[in-house]
Amino acid sequence: MAEQISLVDVSSSVSLRGEDSSNVALLRDVFLPDVAASDPAESSVDVQDEHSSDDSDNENEVFPKQNDFSQRRRIQNAQFEALLSKCTDADSNEAFDRAPIALSDGELSIAHLVKKQDLGNGMLDPREYQIELFERAKTQNTIAVLDTGSGKTLIAVLLLRHTILNELDDRANGKTHRVSFFLVDSVTLAYQQAAVLRNNIDQNVAHFFGAMGTDLWDKRTWDKHLQRNMVIVCTAEILNQCLLNSYVRMDQINLLIFDEAHHAKKDHPYARIIRDSYFKAQPSQRPRVFGMTASPIDTKGDITEAATRLETFLDSRIATTSKITLLREVVSRPIEKVWAYNRLEPPFATELYKLMDTRYGNIKVLEGVYRFAWNASSELGKWCSDRAWWHALADDVLPKLEGNINKLIESNTMKAEHGAVFKDIIRIREASETVKNYFFTDPELPGELSPKVQRLRMELSKHFNDTTGTKCIVFTQKRYTAKILNELFTVLNIPNLRPGVLIGVRPGDIGGMNITFRQQFLALVKFRTGEINCLFATSVAEEGLDIPDCNLVIRFDLYRTLIQYVQSRGRARHCTSTYAIMVEKDNAEHEGRLKEIREAENIMRRFCEILPEDRILHGNDHDLDSFLQEEEGRRTFTVKSTGAKLTYHSAIAILARYASSLQYEKETVPQVTYVVTIASNAYVCEVILPEKSPIRGLTGSPAMRKAVAKRSAAFDTCLLLRKNRLLDGYFNSIYHRRLPAMRNAKLAITCKRTNAYDMLLKPSIWAKQRTTPTETFYGIHMSLLPSKPLSRDHRPILLLTREKLPEFPAFSIYLDEDVETKVLSYPLKHGLQISVDKLQSLTVFTLRIFRDIFHKVYEHEVQKMPYWLAPAEAIDGRGSGKNPRDCIDWDTVSFVHNNDEITFTRNLNPESLVNRFIFDNWDGRFRYFTVAVADTLQPSDPPPPSVPRRRYMNNIMNYTLSLSKNSRARFLSSCDWNQPVLQAELVRLRRNLLDKMTTQEKEMQTECFICAEPLRISALPPSIVSTCLAFPAIISRLDSYLIALEACDELELVIRPDFALEAFTKDSDNTEEHRGQQIHFQRGMGKNYERLEFLGDCFLKMATSIALFSQNPNDDEFDYHVNRMCLICNKNLFNTAIKKQIYRYIRSRGFSRHIWYPDGLTLLHGKDHSTKLLSEGKHALGEKTIADVCEALIGASLLSGGPEHRFDMATKAVSALVDSPSHRVSCWKEYITLYTLPKYQTEKHRGSEDDLARHVEEELGYHFTYPRLLASAITHPSLPSTWGYRVPCYQRLEFLGDSLLDMVCVEDLFRRFPDRDPQWLSEHKMAMVSNKFLGALSVKLGFHRRIMAFSNPLQAQITHYVEEIETAQAESQGAVDYWVVAKDPPKCLPDMVEAYLGAIFVDSKFDFQVIEAFFERQIKPFFEDMSIYDTFANKHPTTFLHNKLTNEYGCTNYCLKAGELPTIDGAPATVLAAVIVHGNVISEARSSSSRYAKITASEKALAVLDGLLPSEFCQKYRCDCKETKNSSSVVEIGTAI
């Protein structure tokens, strides 16, 4: 595959529905070209023009050959491709083996945490009873009933090994591949059991669970997993859906293992797999079944009936060991104790409860808290009851409570008033403050704890005081109880006791109950290592989790079922462990439950003992028909072509998946709505599909149960979708949830790839001049203003044209010994009527200039003259309104017209020859200004040795003469040998006065001694000649201005000539490499495009951001970024430039001796340069150069202003150069016309939003017309959309504000530092817009207090960051750069600043002045002195790495590459970055974005290189770059910018 640098393959998987045609075309151009074309290595070969010499003094000079980097780049690309491919092929299970053991537990993934615990290592040592059950399981479907800790999993491992061996034999015999499925009931068990199997089976073991996005996988993905793996560990619902969708068939499974098999009942996925798929397959196609449980029942009731029913459910037979004594040797039962506590008081209202009930008792969202606190007063005591309020009303819980208030009010049948919502929200906040300010007493005071908790405290104190080796688990029924007990025992500070909490994962929790699978694992790891030795846990710790041996298990809340008793008792695995049960004294219910459970255990034991010897039940078979009869009346539908099956249960999941697929360009996931109503004493459910669905839903059939009505309606809806072909044969949606196709794509184009393009040599205006009737002439008065006195007078001249020329800016030329001289040009306001005679005279005067000064004789053709030159009177700028006729020195014109030359005669006064311009009629190299008469020399004297060397040096007459041999002899025989010798200054052949002299030009001798007779004395005044010697440079620059303006006219842009030319000027082959040594630098071209390109790039980003934001209010930030990337990418700009032939106008060559002459005249005498024009008319340009010029044009348009708004012309330029329907804007004010106010913005704002806007206005000075915009700017994505202010999160506004902030910062730097290059500007802009600074600014502005978020970790991060940044500020002694030393802030803080900017911009109707006002007031004070941030960018890891490799080690053969790793659809993107040095991958890193992956890879590379001496570096990486270093070496590495 070709190099995929930050590129994702979208050729087959991306849905382009709804894309505009230009974006689709761009997608094809970028992603679907020939493979070779997509490889930068193949595309980077330099294209050079063999005739592109720019040194006009040496027409045969050849360019120095450029180094060919394609081979090196090709190797680097291949190495990175191999690395990318390797990482792609390594699936999640192989990645499991690469645990970064050096990291702390807090940094490890769940998989690595499990692996680090080394679960199951060395466990394969089966006991006799295990072998006995294994042998049974080999021959028949079996449910193994063994105590917790007795090694049921080992039996499964033995069975898996046996099955795999048979499978390998079957495959060798050509049979169909089959795999084994190990089904578990929780995500944590999926990790744990997969780890155990991997340590004991030498085949590929995969583990899957729903959060991995498995519901979005298609059949091809599952086929790949089935092909790759021998065993798949997964949660049961995954396999159930796969079987129903026919991704996996029952005949593809050789073994089904059910962990904790007692769950197989009712509608559990275990039962549905058996009922809907297993029993529907032919018996010969069914796999072996093996179930594992500590007790076959988990409910009350008839034990035997429940056990036999389980056997029927799983088509298996219960078996247990006959060697009970052997089992007891392995599993030692703990000592059971009963801890009785005094009777509890009835629930009562504590002081805090009374206070809360009096003030806030009618707030419905607090009902659950009231209920728990009421019961806790009895169960746990006053202190614990009160602390429940502290948890329930913590700061991080408030946003969710406020959201729940909205839900409750809006669920009422009456229309909710905003005031009611606001009132309850205010009261919730008041309640939180009340709890915060409440004084909590010491829990050790009498009466604060219940008798139950006091007994627990007493027993724990005794156990932990007696020994430091105690490890304890305390089981509670409620999660709140576990949480508060953990807090209590932390406060009590019992010696040696280190409490922790382990509760289940449950989405949608409030009150600080949120916990993740990762946090569960961390708690278990800490318990294993002893960091925690007293774990307060709910039922999550009872079942299956491999909790390390502990010697004390306490049932704080009494168990309710036999399985709870067996499972929790099984946690006490130490040989001297204690299992304590807490019961209330004189509580008949507790005593009855103890007795009931003991009897149930005895019944269960007897049940197992009466099993026949062969462990097969006889006479107790449960009727299979009665088992399946439950499903009668519940319809099913099977797609014959695929075998996919639709059931009542699967219909709900299928509709959810279908709704998710409709997420096209929205932030929130579309959901199916079920509305259940009662009609005719039955339940009826209406299914409402998301609005993007072509089918909007239906109303189902009546049913007697609400759940059945819902499933029935979902089933019918699926049938309707299938009928309309909206679901395929596997019940997958025909739509695909669209992740933007261009995510992480590299839409840039290589600046190394060049092609030959046409280049305009002359502006078209000169050709038009020849066809324009000669009636009125327009003049431009041109004069020279030197920075210091020149050696010779330079008289103004007038340039006359048939068409009026624009006003040209002043520019510099270099006269004499590099005296900088401004060329001033003033267009005359009035046209000039010239008679035929006068025009003839002007034509003669102009042609005389070309003949005498430049050795070109043109035919006298008035109609072909593009322009005329005339001597002019001196005027200032105010004199441009003077009558043009009065500006021309007609006397001089007439004199030149009447005198072809000043004739030399023998009686001519020698002094009359001084201060004349004399030229050699036969050799254009010799032009002279006479200085004085050399009285001491005669024509026959040899020339002084200081004169420039010529062929004939025997005497001055011969020295002066240019004739050939025969003509020379005739002349010498007749000339006057007594004429005066003149001291003269030889005019240098230098034409490029736009630049200073070269060293060679400076060294040229100009003092000469000549005779006048061999030469011709020009009738042109020397002052005019002096000025006209600069005319080639002047007219070349004017031509460039005119060509640039011609391009602007083509684009319908009005741009100042100096900015226009700057935008089109490329003065070297690598102009874009701002600080690299310039290759083939073109002298005298003035400013190049790089600064304007930097400015234009920033405006382009802002303009397209505004356009996309305005036209697509429902897009999310992700789509905004992608669509903007499509608009502003170099590829798009390049394509537009090619279409509009912008390349023709680019000035890539400096002054040329060949093309400045007037075009169209007939040359009679002199060297014909027309043969050179063909080669001069082509230039080699890189694709990136052409794209950069487009951005520079936008920058030039910005500086040129506009008719109404200063952004008008730049806005128009963006439309012209982006050339997309997404940006059809001709002026700034049109943006607001594109914007349709979204509903949330115009909704009536609530009191809370008004209050927010008022406070922010007081602090920041901006008054919001739409306060809900501000509410959106502070709403974090973690806050559910129905909570808080019920506005979109800040991501859209942040996208807009980011570009606005960039623009205002760049404009400020561009204006303040006119001489700084783009690299410097970029590095210092980085400081101004960095997350580091914006995070500190966010705290300064108080945004951290206003964020609406729902995330415990985020709140903690913000708190810690605020503490650190405020400390840094306090210790900075007033320094404005205090923020530089702080750690990186949580990203939400800088995001809120940018979102605020977006909000005020939208609220002000797109008034950029509000952004500038914010910048001047809040940001600029930090950056008045930019020198203090000179090293900021250099601290960026990527920049630092680049500098270290280049400057310290002198290495150029390295690169930093990034590419996206393929993921399943719907999963977060993962980008791999790697640093490659001389073919060695020295570091790699992964992240969700290319930027952060490169940063991390750079940091790792710096760590590798730390302390390495240059000599050691060269030896280690075989670096010889210093020996072969070339000035044009180019390194491919990301920068800090």
UniProtKB/Swiss-Prot annotation:
Binding site for Mg(2+): 1294, 1391, 1394
Residue numbers binding ATP: 146-153
Class of the enzyme per the UniProt entry, highest EC level: hydrolase
E.C. code: 3.1.26.-, 3.6.4.-
Motif DEAH box in this chain: 259-262
PAZ domain mapped to chain residues: 891-1019
Residues of the Helicase ATP-binding domain: 133-314
Start and end residues of each DRBM domain: 1439-1507
Residues annotated to bind Zn(2+): 1451, 1478, 1519, 1521
Pfam families linked: Dicer_dimer (PF03368), DSRM_2 (PF24995), Helicase_C (PF00271), ResIII (PF04851), Ribonuclease_3 (PF00636)
Gene Ontology cellular component list: cytoplasm; nucleus
InterPro entries cross-referenced by the UniProt entry: Dicer_dimer_sf, Dicer_dimerisation_dom, DSRM_2, Helicase/UvrB_N, Helicase_ATP-bd, Helicase_C-like, P-loop_NTPase, PAZ_dom
Domain spans labelled Dicer dsRNA-binding fold: 651-741
Domain RNase III, chain residue ranges per copy: 1043-1202, 1253-1405
Region (Disordered): 38-68
Matches recorded under SUPFAM superfamilies: P-loop containing nucleoside triphosphate hydrolases (SSF52540), RNase III domain-like (SSF69065)
Cofactor(s) demanded: Mg(2+); Mn(2+)
GO terms under biological process: defense response to virus; regulation of defense response to virus; siRNA processing
Protein role: Dicer-like endonuclease involved in cleaving double-stranded RNA in the RNA interference (RNAi) pathway. Produces 21 to 25 bp dsRNAs (siRNAs) which target the selective destruction of homologous RNAs leading to sequence-specific suppression of gene expression, called post-transcriptional gene silencing (PTGS). Part of a broad host defense response against viral infection and transposons.
Family under the similarity heading: Belongs to the helicase family. Dicer subfamily.
Protein known as: Dicer-like protein 1
Organism (species): Aspergillus fumigatus (strain ATCC MYA-4609 / CBS 101355 / FGSC A1100 / Af293) (Neosartorya fumigata)
Gene of this entry: dcl1
